Amino acid sequence: MRIKTILAGLSLLFVLSCVNQQNANKPVKTKIEKSHKRHLRKQLVSFIKGMRKGKPDEVKAYFDFPIKNDNFWYATLDYEKWEEYKGKGFGEKEFQIYFDAIFMGDFRETLGRINVNRLLKQGYDKAEYSYDSWNGGFKDILEVTYTDDKITMTFNTVVYSSGGGGEHIYVYVFTTKDGVLKFKDFQSTMVY
């Protein structure tokens, strides 16, 4: 009788250890990835909300100052002045002063139309914003892509009028390592 009890106990321990072993083989990263994605979602919503309001103080946490990127100077200063500032870091003070030149109202309006849930689930979302009048208008298109460690926002604005027009393209790149949103790069180009 005692041997049967011991064998039953050992069998139970064996079964429990197999169950624990199966659970140990499951990737733990899934919970971490979900946690990172939730955290990233909160940050994106906060970033977009701050952008929509045009509040540099609400989005500056996503930037490391001084920003080492001459394109910020190019987007904010006349060509002659831009040359003077090449190679100089773009500080928090300049970020406050030139915020509206770097992140124009049209960009902020279009960014507000991005669906964060769709972006994080599908890796892509697109929003458009346009205005037409009797003498011209504009059309803005913002395409946002999300990969494992990067969010790229490509903003294309086309301005047209009876006297001509032009096209501006701005690309903002953010890293998302470990679910933390941080600015990485900015590029711009203008075509007339």
Predicted regions and their residues:
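Sec-dependent signal peptide recognition
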Residues: R2-G9
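Aromatic-acidic/polar surface patches that form glycan- and anion
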Residues: A8, H36, L40, G163
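Repetitive helical segments and hydrophobic/amphipathic motifs
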Residues: S11-L13
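C-terminal motif of bacterial Sec signal peptides marking the signal peptidase cleavage site
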Residues: L16-S17
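Short, low-complexity N-terminal intrinsically disordered segments enriched in polar/charged residues
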Residues: Q22-K49, K53, A61, K68
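Short solvent-exposed beta->alpha transition segments
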Residues: R41, Y62-G137
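Exposed beta-sheet edge and beta->alpha loop/turn motif
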Residues: M104-Y192
